[in-house]
Amino acid sequence: MHQTHAIQRLEVLPSFSNESPTSRETSESWTNQDDIFYAYASMSPGAEHRGTTQLLRFQLAPIKKLEGSLQTHFLLSSLHPRMTFPGRAGGGEAGSRPPRRPWAGILILQLPSTRGGRRSGHGAVRSWGPWKVVAEQPVGGTDPPAHGGRGRPSPNENT
């Protein structure tokens, strides 16, 4: 995973890779952003669904590490509004939310629950719910997200 990360970082953010040896003290902050940038870089139109999972996997860690990444979240979501969430990839619990607002619902949910909800634990679990569902799809490998991006419920609906 780290190998791909390094390669992608070179392609997407040459400035960051150049500064990596110099700004080691700030490595914590830029690594955090770099993870998010890498996640977006992995979201090529072809690998739409797989990219979504990568995006989640790589962004969950930075979000837990530094809440400042939420700002990067907003920044990136405004830069790539259509690349964030294919919509149906929300699937699972997020299915109840209108798929036309890919990030709006999730981001607004995350801001409060990542900061305050993390303490209670309950709010955080609720917020990560849809994310975990999406991330588990390829791991389980039962049903490809292309069938509607619903993960586990999809096979039941198809039969």
UniProtKB/Swiss-Prot annotation:
Tree of life domain: Eukaryota
Region annotation Disordered: where it falls in the sequence: 1-29, 114-159
Bias (Polar residues): 15-29
Protein name per UniProt: Putative uncharacterized protein FLJ45825
Species annotation: Homo sapiens (Human)
